[in-house]
Regions:
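Active-site-adjacent substrate/metal-binding segments within catalytic domains
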Residues: 65-93, 111-119, 123-130, 136, ...
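Substrate-binding/catalytic cleft of secreted carbohydrate-active enzymes
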Residues: 381, 387-594
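Accessory carbohydrate-binding/adhesion or oligomerization-edge regions at the termini
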Residues: 1-72, 180, 184, 551, ...
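Structural beta-strand segments of beta-rich domains
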Residues: 113-115, 234-242
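Beta-sandwich strand segments
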Residues: 20-26, 186-198, 319-327
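Extended acidic/polar, glycine-enriched regions
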Residues: 154-155, 168-172, 241-337
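Accessory beta-strand-rich segments of carbohydrate-active enzymes
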Residues: 5, 12-16, 82-220, 247, ...
């Protein structure tokens, strides 16, 4: 059974790159340096030099999420964000015992647990050391990654009865996790390589979790509800898929996967599959399990009544012992863009919305769950949005969870802004796209995948690959790709277009779709994904006349779009003001486009 706990408190941080003193397996760590009784120990065990002493004493204790530099509100030099930083946290035996106490040791051949660290987001790239050994490197500020760390830890340290095993020095030695973060705008990592009108800041700006498993574990869990016929008030099928991997020697052929579906705590249905009936992956002790369960007349997920079901997935051994457990939230709904608009549960809805950056004053990206939820509440309840576009990258899982709960639709897109890099850059973009879809495809709020780099030029080979990947990973959602040019090659299902034709003069508020769409796809679904924004920047403290004009521009454009049956929706730029580079904004490093 999987045990998972937040691992966000009690970290240490210092500016600069990782130095050799930190990468040794006998490093005492920054917490020891800040204890007065350990000052002498440190000077003896590390070095007598002031330089080595400073290497441990210039750390400060922090909690995650964290940004490496506290940003001024405005008028800063964005180059100050381009820096190195190190995070360190001691892995304590009590924490391991706590997360493993619920594991049934009888289910495992190996008595030691498999221990994982899961990072939700680190900007921009990082390397992770465990016990002085390099465990992982990761590129990209917006996608999660996971590391198995027990292989870097002595078994005698992991053993519960370690007082009787191993040398005294080995048992007493602390185990440190060190994360070196590089927030440079690396031209090999999307969205960088060209000019970008927003910042990525730097640091471990999302949460970290400590997980433990015994025997086997599930990954890439996905459940997609589909109606069995045209009627939505009849039977549905929930298609469930998962990858299951053995964590130790021994076969998992005879294991079974059980699924239970609940609504408001009441069991709706259950189903199971034997791994022996599943597909083995690449001759490894790994399986791809796929099965379905039926649900009669489910309560639909909708923008006004977002009903969420809990799906529990449990992996059992041949003897009936639980090896792993996960829980998903899913919603029963249909969503489709067509030539006459967008349809949710077969009902046409005009998609009124705004784009959103995930940043905040002073703390950059490092906002916790409550702040993420508050943004969703503002969009849905105060601004009247039906949809939000996650411009221009995958955003916080907490924000997406709130969208599920509030009934706020989401158009989520891969990282990027105008620039398409070379082969290595494109491979990283595809990797980001895959991570985004695998992470988020269980969210009922997401109705469209963005598979083009925002406002980039056509690139047939690259965008053929992004579309193919998205459709393979999720054949049930349509694809879109935000462009700013008319007659662009359309490889996606929906033509998503940034329309800034209105400059405050005349009555040409939006472009006519027939003049924008390629001639060979004149009836393609059509969605406006940006308008207004930089065409009329407005500060909250501007004079009333400008504030009114700003509101009227949004109103004119929305009114015109709603009156055109070919337009599925109209998403404005943007929900909130945001920090930018010197090339953009109002000269003080802020884009007042919210």
């Amino acid at each position: 059974m999987r045990m998972k706990h937040p691992w966000n408190a009690g970290w240490w941080f210092r500016p600069g790159k990782a130095e050799d003193a930190f990468l040794s397996d006998d490093w005492i760590g920054p917490s020891a340096a800040h204890s007065p009784k350990n000052k002498t120990i440190i000077s003896k065990e590390i070095s007598q030099t002031d330089d080595a002493k400073n290497k441990t004493e210039d750390w400060k204790q922090i909690h995650l999420p964290h940004d490496m530099i506290e940003a001024p509100f405005n008028a800063f030099d964005e180059r100050s964000f381009l820096r190195w930083g190190c995070y360190a946290k001691e892995l304590k035996k009590e924490e391991i015992l706590k997360i493993t106490e619920g594991l049934d040791k009888k289910t495992s051949i190996n008595r030691y647990p498999a221990i994982f660290l899961s990072f939700e987001g680190v900007s921009v790239s990082c390397r992770v050391w465990v016990n002085g050994r390099l465990a992982c490197s990761h590129k990209g500020p917006y996608t999660p990654f996971e590391i198995r760390i027990d292989t870097f830890i002595p078994h005698t340290w992991l053993e519960e009865q370690s007082k009787e095993q191993g040398s005294k020095a080995e048992r007493a030695r602390p185990i440190w996790v060190l994360v070196e973060v590089d927030s440079a705008e690396d031209s090999g990592i999307p969205p960088f390589g060209g000019v970008v009108d927003y910042l990525a800041y730097g640091g471990i700006y999302r949460g970290v979790s400590l997980c433990a498993d015994l025997g086997a574990r599930m990954s890439k869990l996905w459940a997609i509800p589909r109606p069995r016929g045209d009627a939505l008030d009849g039977p549905w099928l929930v298609h469930i898929s998962a990858e299951i991997e053995a964590l130790e020697s021994g076969s998992i052929n005879n294991c079974s996967l059980l699924a239970r579906l609940y609504l408001s705590g009441e069991l709706v249905n259950e189903g199971n599959i034997l791994l022996s009936d599943s597909t083995r992956i690449e001759e490894k002790n790994k399986f791809s399990a796929n099965f379905s369960m039926s649900v009669d007349r489910p309560k639909l997920w909708d923008i006004d009544s977002p009903a969420l079901y809990d799906l529990e997935l449990a992996l059992f051994s041949e003897m009936g012992q639980e090896l792993d457990y996960e829980q998903l939230r899913i919603g029963f709904r249909t969503a489709e863009f067509g030539s006459s608009g967008f349809y949710l549960n077969q009902r046409r809805i005009f998609l009124r919305g705004l784009d959103r950056h995930q940043e905040y004053p002073y703390i950059g990206y490092a906002m916790g769950p409550d702040g993420q939820r508050r943004d969703a509440e503002i969009l849905k309840e105060e601004l009247g949005c039906i949809i939000v576009r996650t411009s221009h990258y995958p955003q916080s899982p907490h924000f997406l969870d709130a969208c599920d709960e509030l009934g706020l639709l989401v158009f989520e897109e891969l990282p990027g802004w105008q620039h398409i890099g070379g082969r290595e850059w494109q491979e990283q973009a595809l990797h980001d796209l895959e991570d985004m879809i695998v992470r988020d495809r269980n969210h009922p709020s997401i109705v469209l995948w963005g598979v083009r780099i925002n406002e980039s030029k056509d690139n047939h080979e690259f965008y053929a690959r992004t579309n193919e990947l998205a459709r393979r990973l999720d054949p049930y959602r349509q694809t879109g790709g935000v462009r700013c040019q008319a007659r662009s090659e359309l490889l996606e299902d929906v033509y998503t277009f940034n329309d800034f034709i209105y400059d405050g003069k005349g009555t040409m508020y939006i472009s006519e779709p027939a003049k924008v769409l390629p001639k060979y796809r004149k009836r393609a679904p059509y969605l406006i994904t940006e308008h207004t924004g930089h065409m009329f920047p407005t500060k909250r403290f501007d004079q009333e006349e400008r504030l009114v004009e700003h509101a009227l521009r949004h109103a004119h454009i929305l009114d015109t779009a709603m009156g055109n049956s070919r337009v599925a929706g109209c998403i404005g730029w943007c929900a909130f003001d945001y920090h930018t580079h010197k090339d953009f904004g109002s000269g003080d490093r802020i884009c007042y486009h919210g």
